[in-house]
Amino acid sequence: MTKITKEEVNKVAHLARLELNENEINNHAEQLEKILDYIRQLEKIDTDDVPCTTRAIEVVNVFRKDEKKNSDCNEELLELGPSREDKYFKVPKILNE
């Protein structure tokens, strides 16, 4: 059984544009290892006699026909937000460049 290393957690965090401290790195390594252990358990289950399926239950008539509706409440909706610029919501920057 291979353990998740701190370097692997850092690599995934970097790809996800996350900055993790040492405690978070250790926690994520433990959590990822638990997930992989669970997957290893699932891989051992014999599913040869289980039919293939795409859903747990059959779903029928889940779509409705699209309807075009006029929306004249843009100004009212923008007033509900904490901040706006012209006709758009203004949100804080969350990504570093």
Curated annotation (Swiss-Prot):
PANTHER family: GLUTAMYL-TRNA(GLN) AMIDOTRANSFERASE SUBUNIT C, MITOCHONDRIAL. Allows the formation of correctly charged Asn-tRNA(Asn) or Gln-tRNA(Gln) through the transamidation of misacylated Asp-tRNA(Asn) or Glu-tRNA(Gln) in organisms which lack either or both of asparaginyl-tRNA or glutaminyl-tRNA synthetases. The reaction takes place in the presence of glutamine and ATP through an activated phospho-Asp-tRNA(Asn) or phospho-Glu-tRNA(Gln). It is an enzyme of class 6 (ligase). The keyword Plastid does not apply. Its EC number is 6.3.5.-. This is Aspartyl/glutamyl-tRNA(Asn/Gln) amidotransferase subunit C. It comes from Prochlorococcus marinus (strain AS9601). It comes from the Bacteria. Keywords: ATP-binding, Ligase, Nucleotide-binding, Protein biosynthesis. It catalyses: L-glutamyl-tRNA(Gln) + L-glutamine + ATP + H2O = L-glutaminyl-tRNA(Gln) + L-glutamate + ADP + phosphate + H(+); L-aspartyl-tRNA(Asn) + L-glutamine + ATP + H2O = L-asparaginyl-tRNA(Asn) + L-glutamate + ADP + phosphate + 2 H(+). One of its GO terms (molecular function) is asparaginyl-tRNA synthase (glutamine-hydrolyzing) activity. Transmembrane segments: none annotated.
